[in-house]
Amino acid sequence: MSLRIYNTLSRELEEFSPLQPGRVRMYVCGMTVYDLCHLGHARSMIAFDLVQRWLKASGLAVTYVRNITDIDDKIIRRAVENGETIRSLTDRMIDALHEDADALGIERPTHEPRATDYIPQMLSMIGTLEKKGLAYRAENGDVNYAVRKFPGYGKLSGKSIDELHAGERVAVLDGKDDPLDPVLWKSAKPSEPEEVKWASEFGPGRPGWHIECSAMACELLGETLDIHGGGEDLQFPHHENEIAQSEGATGKPLANYWMHNGFIVTDNEKMSKSLGNFFLIRDVLKKYDAETIRFFVVRAHYRRPLNYSDVHLDDARASLKRLYTSLDLVAPQALAAIDWNDPYAARFKAAMDEDFATPEAVAVLFDLAGEVNRTQSPAQAGLLKALGGCLNILQDDPKRFLRAGTTLDEATIQAQIDARAAAKAAKNFAEADRIRNDLLAQGIVLKDSPTGTTWAAAQ
């Protein structure tokens, strides 16, 4: 079975065929770095980290670009509020972004361009659009894109221009021919810091949000990409405008496959800073380990909404413990490579090849864990660990993972286990039960077997 991807553009599952055999060019819209990242950002990063990992596991070479928006109205406002420079704020937030992403086990993209490093490319594309009659200079000094002059506008959202309305991220400014016309170049305002003003043939100013991605994607990956991704909230207007700009400038499709991840929701509302219902990645990491957060995300299909709550994260942690308990039974055999003809591996691959269906892939892991429990086969345990590696889970030491979270040190716990063994040998079963219950009250579960007693943190 070949890989199939749900293409937002066609609204169908399509067989994936890269432009260049064996190579994939993927661009994903990254963060606007005016504040710390929340779990909604984590979901997008994990989703496309998973995509690029599976593409690599499938034998493809991946060039993955995830941009950084480091010039934006929100960034300017926050820097002014803080009394710091734009560069100081964005450098600090980019460092924090990397700390959060690294903590979650997210691989760095091949390229992570900052918008401010690509101003010449943006100006060049704006100039091309103006020459083609797709951009116009407004009375207020801005340069706007004329959406009604691009025949395909609305094809990603599936609506005509007359059906579309100015969305929450479309600023309706003076001088626009149509409220939907995105700003390509924002003229400098006297009140704005000098560091956000670039010289250009259009006058001093800065780029609009949408043109940033169009120019960076073209510069780093070429005029047509294999995959363009981002959160579902970016379909309109951001990605719709990217298509209009890029295809208007080049005359070629911007991307052959469009992928969009679903929201993390709280109380059925999208998690966002504007709603104030967000949870910072680093705050959640104080309560839950990174692998639990990652597993919480990959248990759901990337296109579906994901409900955040402590209950769901607790359940994710308990489920991970079940898998690690199987790996703790027998030392996994190191595999040189996954045998995809193995029945479990074949099922896992079939799930991932069907639009990265991680819920079905995770179900295979639990079935395989049951097999490991029955057979205690090092080879099967090795396969479980290797398949988990495709999702970047199950790579920790099982004992370390199972024992994490307890406040007791190992020596104290072992002393209690030894005391319980002595009580049982003396047929003082009441004392043995007291020790077991005392440990349980402190979050320690004992497991007796013919070879001795082991322990783990309670689920």
Swiss-Prot record:
Query: Residue numbers of motif 'HIGH' region?
Result: 31-41
Its ancestry begins with: Bacteria, Pseudomonadati, Pseudomonadota, Betaproteobacteria, Burkholderiales
The listed locations are: Cytoplasm
Q: Does the keyword Aminoacyl-tRNA synthetase apply?
A: yes
Highest taxon, organism lineage: Bacteria
Q: Where does Zn(2+) bind?
A: 29, 213, 238, 242
Q: What is its EC number?
A: 6.1.1.16
* Native source species: Variovorax paradoxus (strain S110)
- Main subcellular localisation: cytoplasm
| InterPro entries, sorted | Cys-tRNA-ligase, Cys-tRNA-synt_Ia_DALR, Cys-tRNA/MSH_ligase, CysS_C, Rossmann-like_a/b/a_fold, tRNA-synt_1_cat_dom, tRNAsynth_Ia_anticodon-bd
Cofactor(s) the protein needs: Zn(2+)
Q: How does it assemble?
A: Monomer.
Which family is this sequence assigned to?
Belongs to the class-I aminoacyl-tRNA synthetase family.
The protein's matches in CDD domains, at most eight in alphabetical order, are given as: Anticodon_Ia_Cys (cd07963), CysRS_core (cd00672)
Which protein, by its recorded name, is this? Cysteine--tRNA ligase
Task: Give GO terms: molecular function aspect only.
Answer: ATP binding; cysteine-tRNA ligase activity; zinc ion binding
* Motif 'KMSKS' region: chain residues: 270-274
What processes in GO biological process is this protein linked to?
cysteinyl-tRNA aminoacylation
Cofactor annotation remark: Binds 1 zinc ion per subunit.
A GO cellular component annotated for this chain's UniProt record is: cytosol
Reaction it catalyzes = tRNA(Cys) + L-cysteine + ATP = L-cysteinyl-tRNA(Cys) + AMP + diphosphate
SUPFAM superfamilies reported for this sequence: Anticodon-binding domain of a subclass of class I aminoacyl-tRNA synthetases, Nucleotidylyl transferase
| Keywords of the record | Aminoacyl-tRNA synthetase, ATP-binding, Cytoplasm, Ligase, Metal-binding, Nucleotide-binding, Protein biosynthesis, Zinc
Residue sites binding ATP per the record: 273
